[in-house]
Amino acid sequence: MGKLLVLMLVGMFLAFESLEALEYGDALNKSILFFEGQRSGKLPTNQRVKWRADSALSDGSLANVNLIGGYYDAGDNVKFVWPMSFTTTLLSWAAIEYQNEISSVNQLGYLRSTIKWGTDFILRAHTSPNMLYTQVGDGNSDHSCWERPEDMDTSRTLYSISSSSPGSEAAGEAAAALAAASLVFKSVDSTYSSTLLNHAKTLFEFADKYRGSYQASCPFYCSYSGYQDELLWAAAWLYKATGDKIYINYVISNKDWSQAVNEFSWDNKFVGAQALLVSEFYNGANDLAKFKSDVESFVCAMMPGSSSQQIKPTPGGLLFIRDSSNLQYVTTATTVLFHYSKTLTKAGVGSIQCGSTKFTVSQIRNFAKSQVDYILGNNPMKMSYMVGFGTKYPTQPHHRGSSLPSIQSKPEKIDCNGGYSYYNSDTPNPNVHIGAIVGGPNSSDQYSDKKSDYSHAEPTTYINAAFIGPVAALISSSG
């Protein structure tokens, strides 16, 4: 009888573990599906998000270039190439790092398609060696309207960087995105992979040769942290993609640029570069010791109980860096924590020292897992912050296409001001934007499900992109 009870308990435990694995797999699936709702341009025949339709089919015509496609960045209808490139880099990082886990739930093909939708657009935007289009659409006029992308009639103004008007941040991030993606496609489409890598090299040369901050060339998504982080980030990815020592030597020569930081974002990539480069340190590149020190500083700043903790969690345990769209920082931090714990394990390093406190790899992973679980529902609100995941989730994300009737259900045009009756309606959005992760709760773990609360209710591509790696990391440890 005792033996039978043990077997029953083991069976129940395994069943729970399998269910948990299925839940992470479902979250991964929905995280990727979200991007189909953000697509701009001519939609493919295998489009799964049916409430969307073709949009912005003349983008680029003002300059006689083809800038059709890519992603709408958030809940608006503008295409911002700098954060779109960061999104693409993060997606590719997940595909590289967790290929087996993503394949195990049959999502690798969808993820590659998601990446390619971004890289195809970046390639189009890179019209000559020293020219990159960085924005399509006028942010001010777009943000004053509440329209479906399919009805959009605001100006599709074009912005670009060049040798005479540089933006090293945007060019550097585009280089990183294409270099990372070249690794994703290397084994399945070598010709496309080579094209990506060639453009990545050229973009890096452009970013480095014509150094200038994107602050001077942008109306939205301007740089605050400078361009040195993007140059290090791009060089790290190019080294990973090519093995060419010119890139690792570039990093070593400019290691003094590296800073200990407390965030990883579309603007600040220092810790992303550090996390990539610390792998090379453990492979014997002692000249990269500063990057090891800086990434450890980031980890120590995040870990609860660390004597050098700088980011305090909410009462419910969520990392809280900024009130506006805080989950973007949570998902990127979690990306770094999982990657770094994996790097330590591979190097045979069991722990790190944070001042007077030591943290094991398991403790770092468990904390990272707690952040994923918080987003998926283990939080004081008892709700998922991913639309369509679980039984309770945001129903009014700040998102034009989701909040307005689909063009299939209401073919009549909804103009700039006509959409505000839907915006002001306190009812669930008619189109469930499955997989969208909103900006998240406030510092007290509270969330007001209102379209007007864009700081907390708006999804963005880079929140979702940074979530895919962490949730994939948990698939293998749960099943």
From Swiss-Prot:
* Catalytic function, reaction form: Endohydrolysis of (1->4)-beta-D-glucosidic linkages in cellulose, lichenin and cereal beta-D-glucans
Query: What PROSITE patterns does this protein map onto?
Result: GH9_1 (PS60032), GH9_2 (PS00592), GH9_3 (PS00698)
* EC annotation from Swiss-Prot or TrEMBL: 3.2.1.4
Compartments reported by the entry: Secreted
State the Pfam families in the record. Answer: Glyco_hydro_9
Query: Which region is the signal sequence?
Result: 1-21
Q: In its UniProt entry, what is this protein called?
A: Endoglucanase 20
Identify the species of origin: Arabidopsis thaliana
